Structures are given as structure tokens and as C-alpha cells.
């Protein structure tokens, strides 16, 4: 699942990115509300947004208002100061789904985010399917021919990204940027290692290969005829 973070405190922004990425989310982050609006206008692929209320240029409440004015039901979690009662009330009245006061524990952030996604607001919560492979983003459950497949958070994020783009060849750069959330440096074999592990877990009982190598490009997930 893909989450947008808008937080102007650089240190907290980096922490949020790391926490969500480690939990298996694809993350885009920005430092002000204007950037957040530009991200939101460029794609409708986000499953949730985490917005700091107090940001430069455009504040979090204005971003939230614009989201709701467009008719979007995107789940929104507001980050607020402990004494910002009026802002929290205004945010909830504008259509925020929840809020979290600073400072907060990463476990609580993740729990609140999971709760938002469970409530049905995520646009991409439908079960993904390719051949006999099933991935449920909401329950984070993967099965192959009815067999449960245990995946790490990163393996789950990789498989989800490939299933959302089934049939489309994906370069290593695309995979690293979307799943690992850092710029591609070249020379790294991290994608190849994870693909090999994922194949092993999906083909443990001799099932047909679904993740194929595309020479000089990268990988593609598709069902062979």
C-alpha cells in the first residue's frame, strides 16, 4: 500500500519514512502542504495520507479541505501538537479520519494507520489475483493455490507492487524506488536477492513460475499461457 507523508520537521519526516517502509508500505514524502497537493494531483494511487497540521506554504487543514472538496474519501491521519485542541476539532470536522498528537510511538502510528485502512477507505484494498496467486492488502495475507505463503514485510511490499503492475516489465530502478523508497544507485543486487527468495516461496510445491526475468530490463509478474 502507498502512503503520502507531509511533515516539515526533517528529522520526523525521515523517521516516518523509515517506520512505514520497514512495515512494508510504499512511501512518498514532502515537507509542505503545497508539495502534498502536487503529489495528490499527480496520482490517485495513494491508500492514505499522513498530514502535519502546521506546515509552511499550505497547512495540513487546507490540504485536507482540498482533498474532501474533490470528493475523495482518502483516509487522512493528522499529526498535531499536544495543545492544538481547536485544530484537531477543525480537522475532524473537515473530514479527517483520525489524529495523533506529538510526540507519539511508532507502534501507535502503525496501529492507527492499519485501523484507517481496515475501515474501508483505501481505494486499492481489493484482493489482487494473478493465476492462482492471491494477495489481500487489508489482511496482508498471501496464498498460492489455497496454500498460505508467509512473507516478510519487504517481500510482501515487493509482491504487491509487482501484482499491481502485473504484465508490465519493471526495471530494478523502478522496483527499488517504489519498494525500498530510495534512489537507485546501480550495482546493487538487493532486488535480485529478494526476487530469488520470493520465487522460492511461491514455487515451493512446483507451481508454475509467475515472476519472469526480462533480459536487459528487469522482471515481470504474469501468467504464462
What are these regions (language model features)?
Residues 1-123:
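N-terminal/domain-start alpha-helical segments
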Residues 2, 114-173:
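Short, Lys/Arg-enriched segments at the junction into DNA-binding effector domains
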Residues 22, 26, 42, 69, ...:
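Conserved amphipathic alpha-helical interaction elements at protein-protein interfaces in regulatory
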Residues 59-62, 89-90, 157, 174, ...:
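Active-site phosphate/pyrophosphate-handling residues
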Residues 105-118, 150-160, 172, 186-204, ...:
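DNA-recognition element of transcription regulators
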Residues 175-181:
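DNA-recognition alpha helix
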Amino acid at each position: 500500500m502507498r502512503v503520502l507523508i507531509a511533515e516539515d520537521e526533517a528529522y520526523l519526516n525521515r523517521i516516518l519514512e523509515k517506520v512505514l517502509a520497514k512495515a512494508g508500505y510504499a512511501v512518498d514524502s514532502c515537507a509542505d502542504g503545497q508539495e502534498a497537493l502536487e503529489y495528490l494531483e499527480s496520482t490517485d494511487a495513494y491508500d492514505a495520507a499522513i498530514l502535519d497540521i502546521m506546515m509552511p506554504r499550505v497547512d495540513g487543514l487546507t490540504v485536507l479541505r482540498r482533498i474532501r472538496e474533490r470528493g475523495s474519501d482518502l483516509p487522512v491521519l493528522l499529526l498535531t501538537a499536544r495543545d492544538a485542541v481547536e485544530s484537531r476539532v477543525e480537522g475532524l470536522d473537515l473530514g479527517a479520519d483520525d489524529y495523533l498528537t506529538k510526540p507519539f510511538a511508532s507502534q501507535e502510528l502503525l496501529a492507527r494507520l492499519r485501523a484507517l485502512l481496515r475501515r474501508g477507505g483505501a481505494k486499492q484494498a481489493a484482493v489482487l489475483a494473478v493465476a492462482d496467486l492471491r494477495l489481500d492488502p487489508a489482511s496482508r495475507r498471501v496464498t498460492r493455490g489455497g496454500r498460505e505463503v508467509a512473507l516478510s514485510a519487504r517481500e510482501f511490499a515487493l509482491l504487491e507492487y509487482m501484482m499491481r503492475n502485473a504484465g508490465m516489465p519493471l526495471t530494478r530502478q523502478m522496483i527499488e524506488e517504489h519498494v525500498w523508497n530510495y534512489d537507485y544507485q546501480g550495482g546493487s543486487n538487493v532486488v535480485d536477492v529478494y526476487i530469488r527468495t520470493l520465487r522460492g516461496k511461491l514455487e515451493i510445491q512446483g507451481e508454475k513460475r509467475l515472476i519472469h526475468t526480462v533480459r536487459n530490463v528487469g522482471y515481470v509478474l504474469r501468467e504464462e499461457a
